[in-house]
Amino acid sequence: MFHCPLCQHAAHARTSRYITDTTKERYHQCQNVNCSATFITYESVQRYIVKPGEVHAVRPHPLPSGQQIMWM
């Protein structure tokens, strides 16, 4: 949820689309019936706090029936 920049009431996201892999354009509409402003915001990745390390796949635990999943 975003607040309307004109009246400060809640504005709900109506739709969005990716501009790049790390930037999203989002359309909002103010929920205040006396305002009803529609505006666009941009959401983008600025930096990572933690990045995952290398992932090593392991075999899944056996199911209760004793069988294993055969996807590896």
From Swiss-Prot:
The keyword Transcription applies. It comes from the Viruses. InterPro entries: Znf_Ogr/Delta. Keywords: Activator, Late protein, Transcription, Transcription regulation. Coiled coil: none annotated. It holds the Pfam family Ogr_Delta. The keyword Transcription applies. This protein may act as an activator of P2 late transcription through an interaction with the alpha-subunit of the host RNA polymerase. This is Late control protein ogr.
